[in-house]
Amino acid sequence: MEDFVRQCFNPMIVELAEKAMKEYGEDPKIETNKFAAICTHLEVCFMYSDFHFIDERGESIIVESGDPNALLKHRFEIIEGRDRIMAWTVVNSICNTTGVEKPKFLPDLYDYKENRFIEIGVTRREVHIYYLEKANKIKSEKTHIHIFSFTGEEMATKADYTLDEESRARIKTRLFTIRQEMASRSLWDSFVSPKEAKRQLKKNLRLQELCASLPTKVSHRTSPALKTLEPM
């Protein structure tokens, strides 16, 4: 699964997911299903925001090619993917500027057109079950919830889907592609089934313990290939 994640997702998304997991003391090499889930969620958040701007009249517009006009403002503020301190700083700044109620939990996005925070969900289960779980956790009518599934289903607060149909279709297509790619590598079943995922996690832990017991020769040189991946 780890190899699939690194091949399937943009390196920036992979790096953000790794940082997020390490912030909570989790290892992407062991909890590979969680690694894949975080990368998927991050990509959906970025796709949700892509190409959406607000013009000088306050209207929402889509700009898909070239540099957007200087007068245009990004419609969505992306909160997901930031470290917790920076994320809360952004949330507090938005609340102070707009007067919206501060959420109890970190949301994923802020919509400057509708003036509301958005919680994005990506589920391998039934969308309505995951939606209810999110709603029960957040317990706030002010935070908008939008759930996507790998089967093309979606559910949103008051059936308000925020984005146009084409933008949502792009997200659904990407999720379906991820599912197909996982299935072709025999990874989908363990990604969906908690029982199978637990078995895979134990296998990863055993492999790590085995590798740790082997004698190793440490090299302090950085390969040319790895140098290209180092942050600037």
Curated annotation (Swiss-Prot):
| Compartments, as annotated in UniProt | Host cytoplasm; Host nucleus
Q: Which residues form a coiled coil?
A: none
Q: Where is the site labelled Important for efficient shutoff activity?
A: 202-203, 206
Cystine pairings recorded for this chain? none
**What EC class does the entry list?**
hydrolase
Keyword Hydrolase applies: yes
What UniProt keywords apply to this chain's record, in alphabetical order?
Decay of host mRNAs by virus, Eukaryotic host gene expression shutoff by virus, Host cytoplasm, Host gene expression shutoff by virus, Host mRNA suppression by virus, Host nucleus, Host-virus interaction, Hydrolase, Viral immunoevasion
| Assigned EC number | 3.1.-.-
Q: Where is this site: Important for efficient shutoff activity and nuclear localization?
A: 195, 198-199
Q: Where is the active site?
A: 80, 108, 134
- First-listed, main subcellular location of the protein, grouped into a coarse class: host cell
Q: Does the keyword Hydrolase apply?
A: yes
Q: What does this protein do?
A: Plays a major role in the shutoff of the host protein expression by cleaving mRNAs probably via an endonuclease activity. This host shutoff allows the virus to escape from the host antiviral response. Hijacks host RNA splicing machinery to selectively target host RNAs containing introns for destruction. This may explain the preferential degradation of RNAs that have undergone co- or post-transcriptional processing.
Family of this protein: Belongs to the influenza viruses PA-X family.
Annotated domain remarks: The probable endonuclease active site in the N-terminus and the basic amino acid cluster in the C-terminus are important for the shutoff activity. The C-terminus acts as a nuclear localization signal. The C-terminus is recruited to host protein complexes involved in nuclear Pol II RNA processing.
Return the protein name: Protein PA-X
Q: What gene is it encoded by?
A: PA
